Amino acid sequence: MQYSFRDLHPTNKNEYEDIPTEGFVFGSFDSRKVGWWVVSRDAPTPEENEIVEQIAYTPGVYDFSMLNGERFFGNREITYKIVMPLSVYHERKIFEEEIKRQLMPVGISNLVDTHEDGYYWSGKCKSVEVDDDEEKGLLTATVVFDCYPYAYTNNLEGADIWDDVIFDHWIWQPVKFNVTKSMDVTLENIGSRPVICHFAVTGKVTVKGPGFNGYELTKDNADKATITMPLGKNKFTLSGSGTLEFKFRREEMI
């Protein structure tokens, strides 16, 4: 048997793919795949929905903004400045029209940002402003999104998808329990606010916890039952026979 070999010459050339690795995805628009390069990203914390009163002849103000220890915020703006190097004016014009066409008609949808692996935002595109620099052959777009103030985790608590784990802010905890007798379980919400929790059930299980006396859940009614999962550690008592899964998604002020 005879083999033929191809000579591999040594080289010191560094090869790079001229494809952006940072960007955002909204609707069917992926800034990386189109070829837009992110220059800057701005996501300041949102303004609080304040209720304050000033009383004559008293110092300071009375702040009634909080309820049950929780602060409430308005939407937040997330702004991207992205650039597209193109020497031909006609091509720059095409990309300007296309980014507006792709982003502005879309209603409230998920905004995925490579800067925040493990999270997504929910909102809509507020504006797209474009600057065309003929001298530099550079198209610059400033894209503003109007979003819910908190970011959502990509997956439900307990899914622990390895690629979405944020090790600096994460706990590993079971959320599904096999119930054969009365048992106490503890779940922790390490997010930034209380969140709604749903259930998935087999058999018949009764759950009691903070803020409610008890729900008797079956496969037929579990999808209609919800509770609020407060911040911190929460103790629940489960009884009956079957399995019960707590299904909630953290919301983070990041």
What are these regions (language model features)?
Residues 17-21, 103-108, 201-204:
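A short, compositionally biased
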Residues 153-254:
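Intrinsically disordered, low-complexity segments enriched in serine, threonine, and glycine
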Residues 1-57:
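Polar/acidic, low-complexity leader/linker segments enriched in S/T/G and N/D
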Residues 65-90, 137-151, 234:
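Oligomerization/assembly interface segments of phage tail-like spikes and tubes
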Residues 42-79:
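Short, solvent-exposed beta-alpha or beta-beta edge segments that form flexible loop/patches at the rim
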Residues 9, 81-126:
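Short, acidic/charged, Gly/Pro-enriched secondary-structure junctions
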Residues 108-150:
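Short beta-strand and beta-hairpin "edge-sheet" elements
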Residues 72-76, 103-105, 135-139, 191-193, ...:
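Solvent-exposed loop and beta-edge segments used for protein-protein assembly and interaction
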